[in-house]
Each structure stands twice: as C-alpha cells, then as structure tokens.
Regions:
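Short, well-ordered beta-strand micro-motif
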Residues: 49-53, 150, 172
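Acidic/His- and Gly-rich active-site-bordering loop/insert found
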Residues: 1-89
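Active-site metal-coordination/substrate-binding segment of hydrolases
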Residues: 59-146, 172
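Hydrophobic/proline-rich hinge and linker segments of small-molecule sensing/allosteric domains
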Residues: 168-175
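Conserved alpha-helical elements of sugar-nucleotide-dependent glycosyltransferases
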Residues: 25, 106, 165
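A glycine-rich helix N-cap at a beta->alpha junction
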Residues: 138-161
Length: 175
C-alpha cells in the first residue's frame, strides 16, 4: 500500500458521508477525478460517474469500477489513526469508514499508477448502506461498459465472482 494511498484514504474518511449526507464527499471526489483527467459528472440522484481515457491501449473496451460513497452511523467526525502495526483505525467512538472509502482509494491509486489500462468508467453511488438507493436511481445511460468490478469486499486478496441478488418483497397478510 503506497503512502499516498494511505494519506488519501485518511483524508477521505474525514469527510463525513453518512447515508443521505454524501454530497460534500461526492463534490470533493468529483473535483479529485477531474483533476486526474476524467470527464465526470453527478447524475440526477447525485451518483458520481467518471470516464478515464485508456493509457497505452486504444482498442480495449471500457471496464466499470464501482464503489459507494456512504457510510453507516456513527460516521461523523471520523479521526483515522495509523497504528505502529500499520493498521488504520478510528481514534474515537466512530466507525472508520473503510466501507467503501477503501475501495475508492484503491481505484484512485490504480488509476494513478497503472502503466497500461483500458478506458475506465468509475461509478460511485449514494445510499448503498440503506437499501442500495443510489444504484437503483443511477442513470445507466451514462455508462457504456459491458463488464465491471464492484470494489466493496471485506477480505484482502480475495475476488468475489458472484453473490446473492438483492431482492425486496412487499407482502400483504390478510386475516
């Protein structure tokens, strides 16, 4: 893990973004990805969609990398601390906010350092922690990638290639 990625992760978790209150973080991220050369916007729901051009590859199809911006509670006033063991923890009574700002930090670092890459579409949704509301409202017409990766796993060195579907049911009980 690079020092730059650790610094940026610590910077990101200090920007409050509990579910429903992600606007400040997403505005920061929008400026960040534009500064890295992306064409980027917020869709009508406030989800971030960014397109990064290919590097060293002109024929590859775009790949989607996806994360979410929101955190669970308590996620206001996070103070990250890097321990002597190299592990980043919250200094107080808050969560750390690694879910999913660690994924965002990984994507940003990969985009900065990859010597060759296909075009990348980067989608960062709002309100994942409260029922995937941002993804449900995302403007998919802004995306062209046919393949993608969700950067929201809790196990290092593991790739999840499938998972259960998110389903909601409305049940009416009579009697």
């Amino acid at each position: 893990m690079s020092e730059r990625m650790v610094r940026q992760f610590c910077q990101m978790v200090q920007i409050d973004s509990e579910s429903g209150n992600e606007a400040r973080f997403l505005a920061w991220l929008l400026d960040e990805v534009r500064g890295m050369g992306a064409e980027a916007t917020l869709d009508g729901y406030g989800n971030l969609i960014a397109r990064f051009p290919a590097v060293g590859s002109t024929t590859a199809e775009p790949i989607l990398l996806s994360c979410h911006a929101d955190t669970v509670k308590p996620g206001v006033g996070i103070e990250p601390v890097v321990g002597d063991d190299g592990i980043i923890r919250s200094a107080g009574d808050t969560i750390l906010g690694a879910d999913d700002k660690a994924g965002i930090a990984e994507v940003l670092e990969a985009l900065r350092t990859a010597p060759v890459r296909p075009p990348i579409e980067f989608a960062v949704s709002r309100q994942e922690e409260v029922g995937l509301l941002g993804v449900k409202a995302m403007d998919f017409s802004l995306l062209t990638a046919k393949r993608g990766f969700l950067m929201d796993n809790d196990t290092l060195e593991t790739i999840v290639v499938g998972g259960p579907t998110y389903v909601t049911l409305d049940v009416e009980v009579k009697g």
